[in-house]
Amino acid sequence: MRGIFFLILILNFIGLIFSVAEDCALSKREDRCGSIFEDLTNCYNSTFKMMLGDCLVTCNACESYTCNNPQPDTTLNCTALAGECNSALFSELMKEKCPATCGKCNRKNANLCSDKSKPDICVNLKTLCNSVEFYDKLSEQCPSTCNRCPHNGTNPENKTGGNGGTGTQECTDLANDCSYNQNRCSVKEYSSLMHRLCPKTCNACNICEDANKMCPIWVPRGFCSKFDHDKVQKSCAKSCNICK
């Protein structure tokens, strides 16, 4: 009996591969999804996870999955971490970093603000959210679609995007096509943009750290204030809190 159940499940999955997914924008349900998810509790069953993406309307899960992960998979491979979505240890972190993968694009997470542009425009440009060319523009015009809403729920200002991986933050690329655009790192017209969105690719990271292992001993003795700024920054930038 169990074998028959899984056979039906596989056949339904094959049917979904060669069929059109439900359209969230039109709230249009497909009959096959109604058959697969006749018991709606299966919408939350991991066994049906692979079929859920094509039946978001039936499962009332459009808001949960229709967003972008904040960072491309080249920076944080959410697909590989999908098994941690509901783990006790990492669920909150996964909700923040991988909402689209985990189906956590709710109003308390990815959609805290609204798009400025028309919905159809943002949806059509969604695949460009993490591109170098359109990163800033789409962060401004389509913050909800691109999952770049600030935590306070207000629309972001004109300038958005990364900080170039400077200071104490981990140095990572924000855009997903940095390697393709690597030749722009040294081009005057693009260098500022590239260093901000692709600091790792452009070798423009400024990781804050102490150069001298004696800093923990020197700093309590007044090293930060006794010597000139350049010497302090060169030796104990992190301990003296003067990172660029």
UniProtKB/Swiss-Prot annotation:
Alphabetical keyword list: Disulfide bond, Glycoprotein, Repeat, Signal
Disulfide bonds: 113-149, 122-142, 129-146, 171-205, 178-198, 185-202, 208-243, 215-236, 224-240
Domain of life: Eukaryota
Glycosylation sites per record: 45, 77, 152, 158
SMART domains documented for this protein: ShKT
InterPro entries according to UniProt: ShKT_dom
Domain ShKT: 67-105, 113-149, 171-205, 208-243
Name the UniProt record assigns to this protein: Uncharacterized protein ZK643.6
